Amino acid sequence: IAIVRVCLLAGLILFFYLEHQIGTGLKAEGVENLDYIIVLGCQVKGTKPSKALKDRLDTAKEYMQANPETIAVLSGGQGKMEEISEAECMRRYLEKAGISRERLILEQRSTTTRQNLRYSRRYMDYQHDEIGIITNNFHVYRSVLLARRSGYQRVCGIAAPCKSVLLYHYLVREAFALAREMLHKR
C-alpha cells in the first residue's frame, strides 16, 4: 500500500508540474517584428474554420496587422472530414480579413503538430529567423518545445485565446500529451 501511495503522489506531482509548464504559455504574446509566424492548423468544418482555428486566425490577423513585414506560414493538411486543407481554409480567412496573399505561405501536408513544424521549416531559415508559433493558449508550451526539438533556434509562442468551457479538459489532455512528448526520443 505504501508503494501505491508513493506512486500516486509522484503521479500527482508530475501532473501539477506539467500543468505549471503548460501554464507558462497561456498568455504568451511573442515579440514584435518577427520574420515569420507559423499558424498551426486545427479542424476545418467543411470549408470553414472551427472555433479553435478561428481564434488562432484572429490572433494571426491582429499580429500581422501590427507587424506588416511578418510573413505567415499556414500549416495544416486535409483531414478526413474536411473539404479543403486547413492551410487553404486559413488562407481564405486571412485574405478575407485583408491580409495580402503575398504574405501567406501554405504548408498543406502536415497532420500533427510535429509535422506542422517539420514541414514548415522549408519556407524559412529556421535556425536564424525569428519565428512565432500561433496556437491556442493551452497548446503553446508543447508547440514551442517541439519547435526547439525540431531545430528552431529563435522561436516564441503566441497564444490565441481559448474561451471554451472545455479549457480544463484541454489542459488535462495537454498534460498527458506533454508527458508523452517528454518520453519521446528526440
PLM segments and residue spans:
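Transmembrane alpha-helices and immediately adjacent membrane-cytoplasm interface residues
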Residues: 1-21
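A transmembrane-helix-recognition feature enriched in membrane-embedded lipid enzymes
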Residues: 167-186
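A structural signal for short, hydrophobic/glycine-enriched beta-strand patches
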Residues: 17-172
